[in-house]
């Protein structure tokens, strides 16, 4: 049997005729019902608390703008944040390539999700002890770095569960449901945080009248985010069953830590030999997806430190950004089916680069609202079309492997945007210059995507 037959690919990335087609529902998704799909989506709803509250709009801004405001030395707090997240991304790059493989081979996918989720929640809860004092800046930075690494790694088994709660006929709808749950979960937790703890003026904020002294209101928001994530992460751990051990690749199941890298290298060489289009897309999407993540990671920090948006209004921008990104993703789905995912991604990335250049040239809160929201409109379409692109490339029965590599490559370069953001802030001694770092990542991803051939669109006879 040829290498193409063993891997399930022909040289065009299509189905190999001498390998039997795998029924995904029969192998992993047969028992999946509406309750399991909802439980799976609720994890995304809950995890949005880390992305929206901790990493993007509340705690990271508090850490750089308040806690680190009097930090001695010539390095900006936002540069330290970029480097800390860059280190976390590098750690993920070392461990993510083998984590999904080992989780599945040991039949501990759900257990791994539970452990990594719990570690993420623990770091979030400990952020309550980061007081408004520059001495606590390093403690907060360490918590944010570890939390980011745990959260990124938790996404590996979570994304792998998609095949357990879907079939090839509905994987797009189920995946889109999870994506929407994440966006709208972020909106809800931001609204609760803003109106309950942050809005208003004076020494006590929000409807709950929480004091702002020593950052109490923000520290309570971090604790709320931890409880939110914990509550909505539990259903998937009870509703979706653990996978039985697989015998599909005995070598992968028995491989140790370093042996797992040899297995990964073997699989990548085989894929490169028979389907370079898929490899090209995996590389390109990994790069531009890290740029998309950088938009949300550093957007709030730039809003406050560069464009003069009040701390209390950052959450309003975050809510608006999540709404327009969700609407953009829904709208782009229609164009994806009509013109193909590549055009959607290319147009979205070009539009984002143009909006980013405009942000480099303008100042003030109004201009940030205008061009910031214009930019985020195209984040959702690029994300959803990237998933659709790979779904069209993956041959029947190999979707799990493809999305495992999709996750792996994305995590492997997750240090690029934070590191370049930090580098440009440091090099030009200006927070605004960090925008250039994000734009560079988006532009490199776009350039890498352009030569990748559009996948064939196949209408399922379902």
What are these regions (language model features)?
Residues 153-166, 381-394:
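Intracellular juxtamembrane helix-capping segments at the cytosolic ends
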Residues 19-38, 241-283:
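Juxtamembrane intracellular "pre-TM" segments in multi-pass secondary transporters
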Residues 54-78, 297-313:
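Short amphipathic helix-loop junctions that connect adjacent transmembrane helices
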Residues 128-142, 360-372:
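Helix-loop junctions at membrane interfaces in 12-TM secondary transporters
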Residues 72-75, 195-227, 423-442:
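A membrane-interface helix-boundary motif in multi-pass transporters
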Residues 111-126, 343-358:
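Structural signature of the two symmetry-related core transmembrane helices
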Residues 94-108, 327-341, 425:
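Helix-to-loop junctions at the C-terminal end of transmembrane segments
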Residues 228-239, 436-462:
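Multi-pass alpha-helical transporter architecture, strongest
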